[in-house]
Swiss-Prot record:
Its main location: membrane. Pfam families: ABC_tran (PF00005). GO terms for molecular function: ATP binding; ATP hydrolysis activity. It is a peripheral membrane protein. One of its GO terms (cellular component) is plasma membrane. Gene3D superfamilies: P-loop containing nucleotide triphosphate hydrolases. It comes from Photobacterium damsela subsp. piscicida. PROSITE patterns: ABC_TRANSPORTER_2, HMUV. Residues 13-249 form the ABC transporter domain. SMART domains: AAA (SM00382). Its EC number is 7.6.2.-. This is Hemin import ATP-binding protein HmuV.
Length: 265
């Protein structure tokens, strides 16, 4: 994607009055939010708070009962699916794939919306596998990979998909660190951070408050389908706010070198 400053601080995604009810349970209760380019926005909250439901509504996987979504100032319904695929990439928490593709073939699937040659797709996917750190797995059968390895291969696929997004880029990550070890958690979030610094709008569903505080520019805490807090890490992660939402007392201190909040439970 392009790294021009004009893509920063643009409203990439706007949601108005989103309401979602499934099986008689309200999952989203009239949610309003704007997601801006050039930022990482982390969606936080306890289990069942509505985080993944919100992400799935924003990316079109689930249709809300009511409400509207705009992507770069145009109604989402006005975006042809093949065009939207070039500008919005989604890494789900769990990716099911029943065919015995090689890992590099999975990464190359990201090039399908790009209308490029097979050779170009292979080069692009190989580049992103190196970036994610899975190039050594390129010729492994995908089903033989560990959960974390599969997740990283799919991240390479999503990066390949967004490689021609230009200034309009939205990256959605649903629990991207859940199956990863410490080093790969930070490496994944560093890649997301670099994309946001180039102008991408990055939305991450994450449970780890400390990782969110370290990497996100903006935190949104959801609870019972409603936004309970929205702001910078220091504005949102107060002891009172965290205890009220999660039901557990915490202390909040400043990181000794980088001054982001650190949660001690």
């Amino acid at each position: 994607m392009s790294s021009t400053l004009s893509s920063h601080n643009v409203i990439a995604l706007k949601a108005s009055n989103l309401h979602l009810q499934l099986g008689g349970k309200t999952l989203l209760d009239n949610v309003d939010l704007e997601i801006r380019s050039g930022q990482i926005t982390a969606l936080l909250g306890p289990n069942g708070a509505g985080k993944s439901s919100l992400l799935k509504v924003l990316n079109g996987e689930i249709t809300p009962n009511s409400g509207s979504i705009e992507i770069f100032s145009s109604p989402k319904d006005h975006w042809p699916s093949e065009l939207l695929a070039k500008h919005m990439g989604i890494l789900p928490q769990h990716s099911t794939l029943s065919f015995s593709f090689l890992a590099h073939e999975v990464a190359e699937l990201g090039a399908m919306p790009l209308a490029i040659s097979n050779h170009q797709a292979q080069q692009l996917a190989a580049k992103n596998m190196v970036k994610v750190g899975v190039d050594h797995l390129a010729n492994r059968l995908y089903p033989t990979l560990s959960g974390g390895e599969k997740q990283r291969v799919h991240f390479a696929r999503v990066l390949t998909q967004l490689s021609h997004s230009g200034e309009q880029c939205i990256l959605m990550l649903d629990e991207p660190t859940s199956a990863l070890d410490l080093a790969h958690q930070h490496h994944t979030l560093e890649i997301a951070q670099a994309l946001s610094q180039q102008g991408a709008a990055v939305i991450i569903v994450i449970h780890d408050l400390n990782l969110a505080a370290q990497y996100a520019d903006r935190l949104i805490i959801l609870n019972q389908g409603k936004i309970q807090a929205d702001g910078t890490p220091w504005q949102v992660l107060t002891p009172t706010a965290v205890e009220n939402v999660y039901g557990w007392p915490v202390q909040v201190i400043a990181h000794p070198e980088h001054n982001y909040p650190v949660i001690l439970a």
